[in-house]
Amino acid sequence: NAWGMPFTATAAGSKHVYPGPSPDPEDIAMLIEEEGVTVTAGVPTVWLGLMEYCEDNEVDLSSLDRIIVGGSAAPKSMIRWFDNRGVEVLHAWGMTEMSPIGSVSQLKSDLEDAGYETQLDKRGKQGIMVPGIEYKIIDENDEEIAWDGEEFGELHVRGPTITKEYFERPEANEEDFEDGWLKTGDVVSVDPDGYIQIVDRAKDVIKSGGEWISSVELENAIMAHDDVSEATVVGVPHEKWQERPVAFVVPAERADRDTLEEGIMELLRDEYPKWWLPDAIEYIEEVPKTATGKFSKKDLREQYSGDRLLAGNTPDEAAPGQDD
């Protein structure tokens, strides 16, 4: 974490290695090799880029023990790739307002002997809340959801390390704080073991025909395809269903673009109901990113027309509740 790492590294007596404001995968690979980096952190797009670079170049990652991932969800395919090279990927979640850590996805002791796929499922989530943080998850009806890993709602948190208000921002304070609780803006689910999973940002969750679709879950599934370099999913306006998902995909250099779209759809059909499937897949050269490396869905919405993206799809093709 940009706030926490300098302090923890110093407290541990570790050397700091800073890659600069806009490092590319080659720079990161070089620093890991030459500086003997053991622990590093960054958003998933950084490590997806490193993965692709390593596939085409000989890179020595033997010094690297752990990657801490935050900012957005890491695809399980990414965690598996680094596991196969002896590098642990540790999910964490937090906010500046939380000073900054909220949860860490370490395995509970009763899961240490579980099978790899079970452990991977837990490690692919944002984890368990750190001590001192109280939380609840609220649905559209202001009711707390069940801890079943299926229902989801907005995550609210409170605790001694969480700010109680913003400085001189009365409108934001009224919107984001209620009775001592901070409304995080993250839509999450929580499983019976207490592991939270970020489903989406509240502003990015796709509302289609009265149902919610997780753009993050679709993105991670698409990026599990071997011929996909990057992918993001946004909701575009739809006359009948309110919104429908559209996927923006950056094909890997080796990809056959003529068959990739059907390959992606086949992958999604095996995992998700019909009404979750994207109404369109657009190939792009690069997903726009924010200054911190997160995907900028706002830029995509501004660049592309929903009418054009959904052209040719009849409304009933992806109707919620019309799954086979």
Residue ranges of model-derived segments:
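AMP-binding/adenylate-forming catalytic core of the ANL superfamily
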Residues: 40, 159, 164-165, 187-276, ...
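Conserved beta-loop-beta connector loops within the AMP-binding
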Residues: 132-156, 192-193, 255-261, 296
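Conserved AMP-binding/adenylation subdomain of ANL enzymes
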Residues: 1-38, 53
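Gly/Ser/Thr-rich phosphate-binding loop
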Residues: 11-14, 34-42, 48-121, 134, ...
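Active-site glycine-centered loops adjacent to acidic/histidine catalytic or metal-binding residues
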Residues: 71, 94, 127, 186, ...
